């Protein structure tokens, strides 16, 4: 199941990169707004639950919680 999820996410990233490189960006304002909203998302503090390391401020997730760096 994990392998299938990784393959799916990789395919989505490749498709997005290919579309952007061809200049087929239809909603430029929406895309830039989305980019800035992603930049302002907050990370999960230590001792709080996580699933992946990128969620944690310290980038250290040992399930089920974030650890301080």
UniProtKB/Swiss-Prot annotation:
- What taxonomic lineage is listed for the species of origin? Eukaryota, Metazoa, Spiralia, Lophotrochozoa, Mollusca
Q: Which cellular component terms (GO) are annotated to the entry?
A: extracellular region
Keyword terms, alphabetized: Disulfide bond, Knottin, Secreted, Signal, Toxin
Q: Where in the cell is it found?
A: Secreted
Q: Please give the chief subcellular localization of this protein.
A: secreted
Question: What InterPro entries does the annotation carry?
Answer: Conotoxin
Tissues in which the UniProt entry reports expression: Expressed by the venom duct.
Renumbered to this chain, the signal peptide range is 1-17
Q: Enumerate the propeptide ranges.
A: 18-40
Q: Which GO terms describe its molecular function?
A: ion channel inhibitor activity; toxin activity
Cystine links in this protein are 43-57, 50-61, 56-66
State the domain notes: The presence of a 'disulfide through disulfide knot' structurally defines this protein as a knottin. The cysteine framework is VI/VII (C-C-CC-C-C).
The similarity annotation says: Belongs to the conotoxin O1 superfamily.
Q: What is this protein called?
A: Conotoxin AbVIE
Transmembrane spans: none
Matching entries from Pfam families are given as: Conotoxin
């Amino acid at each position: 199941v994990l392998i299938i999820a990784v393959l799916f996410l990789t395919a989505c990233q490749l498709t997005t990169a290919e579309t952007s490189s061809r200049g087929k960006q239809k909603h430029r304002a929406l895309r830039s707004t989305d980019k800035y909203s992603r930049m302002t998302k907050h990370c999960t503090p230590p001792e709080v639950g996580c699933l992946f390391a990128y969620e944690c401020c310290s980038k250290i997730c040992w399930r089920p919680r974030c650890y301080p760096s």
